[in-house]
């Protein structure tokens, strides 16, 4: 599938992708800190949570904007919505990894 994204939504999609990338990068930094400097893990995990929340907000706003477009066909709206959901799920999975990592940090510190 190749979703045709309307020009007026390009900035919102770009903002969503940037937040998701920031969440994943914070998760990677958190994982690296687990092996090098365990005290720094918590700071990176907070950043993962922050970026995931931001991506959720942008995702919700974008989905609302998609369904407010009267000139798009329903099938196109559904395709764009699914695309937004899949991109947002990447940030959700990064947060899941960070949550599991926090459990390992607690176990390691005992």
Identify the residue ranges that each predicted region occupies:
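Cytosolic, long alpha-helical scaffolding segments
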Residues: 1-110
């Amino acid at each position: 599938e190749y979703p045709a994204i309307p020009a007026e939504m390009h900035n919102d999609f770009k903002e969503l992708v940037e937040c998701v990338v920031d969440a994943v990068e914070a998760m990677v930094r958190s994982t690296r800190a687990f092996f090098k400097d365990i005290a720094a893990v918590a700071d990176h995990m907070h950043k993962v949570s922050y970026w995931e929340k931001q991506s959720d907000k942008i995702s919700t706003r974008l989905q609302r904007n998609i369904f407010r477009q009267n000139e798009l066909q329903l099938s196109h709206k559904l395709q764009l919505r699914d695309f937004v959901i899949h991109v947002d799920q990447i940030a959700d999975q990064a947060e899941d990894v960070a949550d599991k990592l926090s459990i390992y940090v607690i176990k390691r510190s005992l």
